[in-house]
């Protein structure tokens, strides 16, 4: 089976791909100092929570924003003798219209591929992670840029670690904006403030994308993803068309299917992709069998 593996700065997210289904989707804390052995133990342990194991993995589709762990994952795949595809700007099946494509995180590009394939274009993906990213896809299916803000948990951590008397608090939406104690005041500033930031930036981006693409703002697909996309405060955001916490994993599955020529959905093939040729995606590491 294919293992979709997303290595972020905060979390490692993975899932086994079976047809159109992401199975055994799990998250764990990223440990940048991991060895190939430690990464394999982590992945195997997560898969075993759902009755699977590394023995079931025949290929790995990887998006990583941690360069050291990209190398660790490559070494792990080579030792196990499984194919590895590393997503990056050089093997995306869509035009990338930004000044320096090499600076765009692999997860952001994978999200763009997934949203275009699964939800249509033009589109905006909002990914709530260590950073919150806003990524835009044009009407003709090109990645055209976006925005990056500190993630909500990063802001909360900064408040607690950089001040003498502010405590660490739970990310919970307060009943009102005016807090009557330290905890409720912090919850108001962090949760309600972050929601306002997200809404304001999303509205600006949607308006600008609609203008450049000559479409009505209401015709732009807005999809939330990331672990916090299912948080109560995020689920209440207006103007959102879908919440898809596994969007990145689905994008990795799509990229693998395009690279291998396998059907993405029943009756579909890589040749049906409305972007660059599937052959532009290559397996960058394939251990000898």
Kindly give the residue locations of the regions a language model identified:
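Phosphate-binding/catalytic loop of phosphoryl-transfer enzymes
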Residues: 74, 82-162, 191-206, 288
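A mobile "lid/hinge" subdomain adjacent to the ATP/sugar-phosphate binding pocket shared
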Residues: 160-192, 220-221, 226-232
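Conserved phosphate-binding/catalytic loops in two-lobed NTP-binding clefts
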Residues: 81-93, 237-253
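Short glycine-rich phosphate-binding loop at a beta-alpha junction
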Residues: 54-65, 83-85, 213-227
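Short glycine-aspartate micro-motif
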Residues: 2-6, 59-61, 123-127, 221-223
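Phosphate/pyrophosphate-binding loops at sites that engage ATP/ADP/AMP, CoA/4′-phosphopantetheine
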Residues: 43-58, 201-218
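Short glycine-rich, Thr/Ser-proximal phosphate-binding strand/loop in the N-terminal lobe
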Residues: 2-45, 141-167, 173, 184
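Glycine-rich phosphate-binding/hydrolytic loop that grips phosphoryl groups
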Residues: 241-289
